[in-house]
């Protein structure tokens, strides 16, 4: 009887310690990301766009944890990098698959140079691993089978506009190769209505959700879930200068600026895919 009681108490103690440890780990995960999001070191213009980009909700939907190995595709000026790099710095790994160093495109060179400067000078970026990515030509974004998560934000239209379907498909195949079995691909993209012509994807900067899902499936991914976190019902996706008519680009300048500011940033699909086990 006494032994049974001791065993029961021991089991209860183990269960309590396990629960406490799990709760503490969960809290650490949340606080690491929350700290990165709320940091005063974030660029003020970047933080102001949270109302349209919903980073906390988006990363939660994808299942992001600061212990993961995460690859961000084409981080550009580092809008999401300001969140991901510090959140992953202590316990995880962050690969920034940036523009190729041998690119002849001036914008790519300037963007890469600016990002490298951040990595060199900003302590928050000190653990960032920079790799190269371009559809078809530069696809080694991380060691094969090493990543828990690949993230791409508003990029698919660029690959499609630049190299048509083959370019976009090569990107998804690179993501698949980098991920571990069971790994997650998190994707956000400007959304074109399904009834619109496929040709509109070549110039508008918007993509059909069904088309993007099909590309991912062709590369081997399974669609896990979709979310309306980044939806904007005010966006009709039929603007004179495509998606760039809207904020933050406002390609028309002062012409109808108030109208487009009232619409806000684009309507976006938010998709979570999995590499099968």
Regions found by a protein language model. Give the residues of each.
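A short glycine-rich, Lys/Arg-flanked "PGG" loop and its adjoining helix->strand segment in the class I
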Residues: 85-86, 166-181
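Conserved beta-strand signature within the Rossmann-like core of class I S-adenosyl-L-methionine
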Residues: 182-190
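A short acidic, Gly/Pro-enriched loop at the edge of an enzyme's catalytic core
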Residues: 139-151
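N-terminal signal peptide c-region/cleavage motif recognized by signal peptidases
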Residues: 21-23
């Amino acid at each position: 009887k006494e032994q049974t009681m001791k065993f029961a108490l021991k089991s209860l103690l183990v269960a309590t310690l396990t629960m406490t440890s799990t709760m503490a780990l969960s809290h650490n995960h949340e606080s690491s990301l929350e700290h990165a999001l709320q940091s005063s070191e974030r660029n003020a213009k970047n933080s102001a766009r949270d109302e349209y980009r919903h980073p906390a909700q988006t990363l939660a939907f994808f299942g992001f944890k600061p212990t993961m190995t995460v690859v961000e595709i084409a981080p550009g000026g580092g809008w999401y990098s300001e969140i991901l790099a510090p959140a992953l710095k202590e316990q995880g790994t962050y690969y920034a698959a940036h523009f190729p160093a041998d690119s002849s495109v001036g914008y790519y060179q300037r963007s890469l140079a600016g990002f490298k400067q951040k990595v060199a000078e900003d302590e928050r970026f000190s653990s960032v691993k920079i790799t190269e990515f371009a559809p078809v030509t530069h696809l080694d974004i991380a060691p094969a089978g090493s990543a828990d998560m690949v993230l791409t934000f508003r990029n698919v239209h660029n690959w499609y506009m630049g190299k048509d379907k083959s370019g976009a498909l090569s990107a998804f195949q690179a993501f698949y190769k980098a991920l571990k079995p069971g790994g997650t691909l998190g994707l956000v993209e400007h959304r074109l209505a399904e009834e619109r012509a496929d040709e509109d994807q070549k110039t508008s900067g918007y993509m059909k959700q069904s088309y993007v899902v099909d590309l991912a499936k062709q590369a081997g991914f399974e669609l896990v879930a979709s979310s309306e976190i980044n939806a904007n019902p005010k966006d009709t996706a039929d603007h004179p200068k495509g998606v760039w008519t809207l904020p933050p680009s406002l390609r028309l300048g002062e012409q109808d600026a108030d109208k487009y500011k009232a619409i806000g940033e684009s309507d976006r699909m938010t998709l979570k895919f999995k590499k099968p086990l």
